[in-house]
């Protein structure tokens, strides 16, 4: 250490305090990185890795750097790669420093604590989440530092906690260090493998310590005053988040003004599998927004509205009155398209007020941010005027909550120029006429620059040197440049400052005097402008709560306008949401598939479910016929109705439900991987259980290839059979996509295999095997013959459904239900039996 330069020792001392972060070490106009940080950063950023002067021991110091005024995209790339970045600034003016400049880390940027737009997706929240537990009670809290949103809840059991965690989708997670070792809780780390994880020691979760953190952040607030007195474990998780803020942001987050507690019973519950299968916010195959329910429904024009819509989809309501209020607002905007379009046009010019407010409160906002705030606030009176014409209760309530902040808008309009520069220290931010001292300094600067122009003309005339130039650089200030060919013509009062290959540079006493006057004024202008800008930014920060409330109201208006436009354009109906049990949908459509541009017209279907004769619907039919689509569309229509949205149907009566479960697709087949007999047995028992459990009386759509299950309608009064209508033509099938009463008589496996593109030779052989099986062609020992050969009469009658023979091949073939075979299963069966013979 003693052999290192003073600056390198300073770097290592500060780096030791932040070993898990890449240290951005401010050196003049650059952030520099050294040693391992430089090696890692240069690789991630794709920038040149060089080295500083060798240490006293002869070793080189790896080095890379980025300009401080354009560091945002570099930081964003590092954070996206999962790295933490510690910003180390110069804590004093280098000109005034005695010895090495003092430096200190002002903040640590982590994946869950970014606030700059370069690191954020406009319509996605960026959550930091903390999870802890006491026995089976799990406390969960999450914060979006960019918007100030801070929520807490408690959940019963690990699976419920994991379901909520996956719904929230945090960028970074805080866990107790004990979660590293406890086998049960290692599941958490497996679920969040693509997230940045920080582990805290157990002392961070001390209740008294967490209470102090809460009181410090929220101006003496208690658990009771925050509404968290019945959520003690969630409050510990909140304490962990606040501890992280203190550690990384020096505890400076004034726009985080409160905690919003919530209970999972306030919303329709959706587990992770249901969210995934229904493709609520991302597609199942590619994980993309486009093609999901969110992708379809999002016609919002603000980033705030986009985030709010996602929350509404993830957390459908359980309160009928709130649902009706949303429906009333959507209906009024549907019936007043002029108001809706005018409102959307005005909202489209509103910037992301939530994130602007976050950066302003964190003293990270630029002059561009204040200009965006001014532009947004200037639209509020017109928005309020449009909404004031509406009579729906929710629209009136939202409009009353929009605060125009006239005085703040006026302040920014007077203080900040229309198109301010990006770099604060370059000046040109404050408008003329805002500050008298600044105006006077600018006059001096302009006069001085005019003098320079006049002096250049004067010197050209005095010397006769037409190529004479007066120029400026940061090293020498103002100087007179004369080419070598004209040096003999210079006057005696010229003082040489620098010799170049082709020119000489001079100053004169008069030039030096004016330089001091002009440059002194320009330095003072920049300092004063920055000071005035900070005053305006602080004035805006003081209105943070008002800005946040207004932003939330605007986001809700944006969502309501979006849902209204969607319902109008797609011909959706207003569902009748009620507390009864009947679910009745007339001409219902899958919202996403109905929106796809396809050569095949979407076929709507009716649905009737209740707690009486239509509690459980068994749906049979071939693969690719539309069973999964039908089930998904019923679930999505129910979910959309409880969002308060209109739904894709001609008419809909939707009961309030507390949970939706879906297991749809090949990977979620009930009894997948079992023998046919086992599968039928399990499916039969599950259907009986769902029907007979009157405590929950779950309304159920049960799609199956087990045709035996259609017999349940005979033994259970609440079970009905339906199938997907199919027409056969010329050995081919046409899917009619219509749900009709009764069970399916065939599975059409071979026809589906043809549609799936299997080779014709395979299709023909499968047909031959199927004929042999259906006609009962047997070989020696009474085994059904799959190979080509003569037919031998069967030696004994077929065993019962759940019987089994002793012979391996006989037993295997007795299990085969031909009508249920998928193309792939048929091929696998052929291969299996060939190996057994």
Curated annotation (Swiss-Prot):
Q: Which residues form a coiled coil?
A: none
Q: Per its UniProt record, what SMART domains does this chain match?
A: MUTSac (SM00534), MUTSd (SM00533)
| One GO location term (cellular component) | cytosol
Q: Which domain of life is it from?
A: Bacteria
Provide the GO MF annotations for this entry: ATP binding; ATP-dependent DNA damage sensor activity; damaged DNA binding; mismatched DNA binding
Q: Which Pfam families does the record associate with it?
A: MutS_I (PF01624), MutS_II (PF05188), MutS_III (PF05192), MutS_IV (PF05190), MutS_V (PF00488)
Q: What's a single GO BP term from this record?
A: mismatch repair
Q: Which UniProt keywords apply?
A: ATP-binding, DNA damage, DNA repair, DNA-binding, Nucleotide-binding
Check the record and name the InterPro entries matching this protein.
Answer: DNA_mismatch_repair_MutS (IPR005748), DNA_mismatch_repair_MutS-lik_N (IPR007695), DNA_mismatch_repair_MutS/MSH (IPR017261), DNA_mismatch_repair_MutS_C (IPR000432), DNA_mismatch_repair_MutS_clamp (IPR007861), DNA_mismatch_repair_MutS_core (IPR007696), DNA_mismatch_repair_MutS_N (IPR016151), DNA_mismatch_repair_MutS_sf (IPR036187)
Q: Which residues bind ATP?
A: 621-628
Q: What does this protein do?
A: This protein is involved in the repair of mismatches in DNA. It is possible that it carries out the mismatch recognition step. This protein has a weak ATPase activity.
According to its UniProt record, which protein family does this protein belong to?
Belongs to the DNA mismatch repair MutS family.
In terms of HAMAP family, this protein maps to: MutS (MF_00096)
Designated name of the protein: DNA mismatch repair protein MutS
Q: Which organism is it from?
A: Citrifermentans bemidjiense (strain ATCC BAA-1014 / DSM 16622 / JCM 12645 / Bem)
